[in-house]
From Swiss-Prot:
It is found in: Host nucleus; Host cytoplasm. This is Protein Ac66. Interacts with the putative E3 ligase IE0 and with viral ubiquitin/vUbi. The gene is Ac66. Disulfide bonds: none annotated. InterPro entries: Desmo_N. Keywords: Host cytoplasm, Host nucleus. It comes from Autographa californica nuclear polyhedrosis virus. It holds the Pfam family Desmo_N. It comes from the Viruses. Residues 132-151 are annotated as: Disordered.
Amino acid sequence: MQRWPKYGGTDVNTRTVHDLLNTINTMSARIKTLERYEHALREIHKVVVILKPSANTHSFEPDALPALIMQFLSDFAGRDINTLTHNINYKYDYNYPPAPVPAMQPPPPPPQPPAPPQPPYYNNYPYYPPYPFSTPPPTQPPESNVAGVGGSQSLNQITLTNEEESELAALFKNMQTNMTWELVQNFVEVLIRIVRVHVVNNVTMINVISSITSVRTLIDYNFTEFIRCVYQKTNIRFAIDQYLCTNIVTFIDFFTRVFYLVMRTNFQFTTFDQLTQYSNELYTRIQTSILQSAAPLSPPTVETVNSDIVISNLQEQLKRERALMQQISEQHRIANERVETLQSQYDELDLKYKEIFEDKSEFAQQKSENVRKIKQLERSNKELNDTVQKLRDENAERLSEIQLQKGDLDEYKNMNRQLNEDIYKLKRRIESTFDKDYVETLNDKIESLEKQLDDKQNLNRELRSSISKIDETTQRYKLDAKDIMELKQSVSIKDQEIAMKNAQYLELSAIYQQTVNELTATKNELSQVATTNQSLFAENEESKVLLEGTLAFIDSFYQIIMQIEKPDYVPISKPQLTAQESIYQTDYIKDWLQKLRSKLSNADVANLQSVSELSDLKSQIISIVPRNIVNRILKENYKVKVENVNAELLESVAVTSAVSALVQQYERSEKQNVKLRQEFEIKLNDLQRLLEQNQTDFESISEFISRDPAFNRNLNDERFQNLRQQYDEMSSKYSALETTKIKEMESIADQAVKSEMSKLNTQLDELNSLFVKYNRKAQDIFEWKTSMLKRYETLARTTAASVQPNVE
């Protein structure tokens, strides 16, 4: 069979090369057309800039030439362009590359001095193909009488493009489902862009439409007044953003918790007077309890000692958690190393598996070809067996005829000898008697006998020619037997190659099973790590709740101290603390808060690092597992849309299920390979037995023909010719059938290559879209991290400013 060269696992034939050349020529023609279009577009932009220097060239749309002309060149409709003193072909030419040269002319020589770098003034937009303009038939605009304008006039109605209509429809749909200020701003931008394209003298209209955005100031008026009032009365400045509600809720939550700690009852808001009364009463109780519990020049109170105990306990707990996090990070590192090792082993096994799969595909093709040849040989053997049986029957008949002919020949020989004797006697008698009549009679008899002898000699010559033809047929049979022996040797060579491939396959199967076992062990370790992480997360949440309560309690005391230090503070009873003691306690609490915040920040960083390492490990496992297995797991078990799933958001159970599905798939493929190998060995053994049987049959026929010389001498020529004709017909049929089958196989192979190439192109397109989505998500994550860092920095500065004491 004909073997085509391969490129990337695909057969490369003349048809593929022809298609590639046609594609290259088409792309080259399109690129030249685009270059000419881009050159003309740059010349138009230069004309626009010269005629109207105030034009914003950065907002030009390359595929909207009519809108460009209507927008920037409508004022010059009645102006004589020839009166311009600018040389367009000379001015600003340094901003553009030279115009494309036709194919028949040689390219211009490059200039000797290096050209200066081109400023990115006109080259900051992507190049698009020419906009496909469609010229509708001219229609007469409807005339309508407009009141208040001064009579009847014709109105020029504009028509939106398909892109503008689709964009407005999408905005309308979004505004119907979820009305937000961002959608309103998008609508205003789209409307301004449409007005700029379709309306002449649109400056006033654009200004009017842009003023719609000032409605936001009316919407935000109440929030602005609220924030200004809060700042005037509390010296705390808020901003109108997504954290405004959270900040206010934090203050309210703090008040309710302090109210519960002091009053031992839940706070319920009814009226403003009640809230004022509760606030004054709560402040009085806290002030009284603090002033009574504080002694002059005394060391820290029982609450301070308890706070130290709590801090030490929290420090110990943070140390334990940090050690545990270090252990988890070490386990993650070891797991990552094992995953990398397994990944390399998996890549090697995958490469070997692909090679074996290609060899198996070649063996399958050879197998199908051998099966086809075997079927043809079986048919030929059947026909030969029938022919041999017919020849045996004919040989039996010919043997009987030969025996009869032998008897006739013996009789003829005896008669000839007797006639010769009679002739000799008659000649003697003639010579003696000279009887003329008797001599004539004898001459007639002699002539008749000579004719009979000639007939017998002709029959002997025919028998000799038949025997020579039978010898040729025997020689041909021997050549066929030799071909069968060569085919048997090639089959034995293929058997050896298959045995070697089977040995390699068994070795790879053992390595693959070992890899699967290691993956299973890694999966178990990952499940244990996930369980440990969940428990650690729960403990972290509990510790965070405890820390929040402690911080709230300490912050309440700190706020009380800050109120005491204010100049407008009027104590109810005589204070028992001096200024030095207050400063001492304030510094002590500030140091404690700073240490606690630093420890909490370290713990948060460690937790974030462990979470990021776990997400990286999940991403690596998901990248190893094929995409179709992940999609099937998500659809069957979690009912989740695949395009909305990120590898970092997958649970550990989903990742484990995907790895298990991958292992099961490879086990099924291994079983299928073993089954196919067994079937192939069985069919190969049957083929060998059939070839051996055919060989023995041909050898027996050859021995029979060589052993019987009478068979070689006395075959009928007519039947042998019929047999020869049938053999030639069968050979021609076999050749024609082989040619047609080869053509069919080539067409099937070409169709398969085309389908596989189309599938490969589809998968490449999907991969490109996935890479685009990945880049977009990565950009969003980077922007989110940047905004979070800015917010954390703002929060840290606000916290530091609030911690500083008010020193007068």
